[in-house]
């Protein structure tokens, strides 16, 4: 992955004095996702890196693996499809945090988001403004999830909202059982939603980041 393709935050102190963190955005988003910027401001003791990911889960996992290999992050956070992507990425030395991982992505696309063309929510580095979701993609998601087991990081967490307005509450409960069975520690934000809220960030800070990175936290 070329350096010019990356979006890197510019929080002080200088980047080379902080550990690296990667943010993996969800479907219909990009490197300039608002959530990534919120996380980089809250956890500015890390040098945050992200890039544009596409709609192909297998390709996203390969792309994330390349980024991990190059930048050796200590922390990786992904939301929605980004949370799903990071669960399959090889990062044994990083703390993984999957927020509302979209294990039911195919059903969500078919029944909630809808097949066809859609606009991206933010400006992307690749210049793309629209993308297409197809039934073939949905089948590809299902095939990939069926054929692969989530991998663990140095520590692995999955954070869910009690009410997930996009994936559905029932799908969220099923996902909690699946990821918990794979070795991820499951945390639930009773005030959360699919789109990350301040309460979820507080939960991540208090229960994960502050404990996993005691020497790096403010």
Stretch-by-stretch model annotation:
Residues 11-12, 16-71:
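Active-site catalytic motif of lipid deacylating hydrolases and related acyltransferases
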Residues 1-15, 136-144:
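Short N-terminal or domain-adjacent regulatory/targeting segments
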Residues 89-90:
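Aromatic pocket-lining residues of Rossmann-like dinucleotide-binding sites
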Residues 74-77, 95-97:
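Residue in the alpha/beta-hydrolase core beta-strand immediately N-terminal to the catalytic nucleophile
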Residues 77-86:
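Gly/Ala-rich beta-loop-alpha elbow adjacent to hydrolase catalytic centers
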Residues 95-217:
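The alpha/beta-hydrolase serine catalytic core
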Residues 23-27, 77, 159-161:
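Short hydrophobic segments within beta-strands
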Residues 32, 36, 40, 86, ...:
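Short, highly selective alpha-helical patches that border small-molecule cofactor pockets
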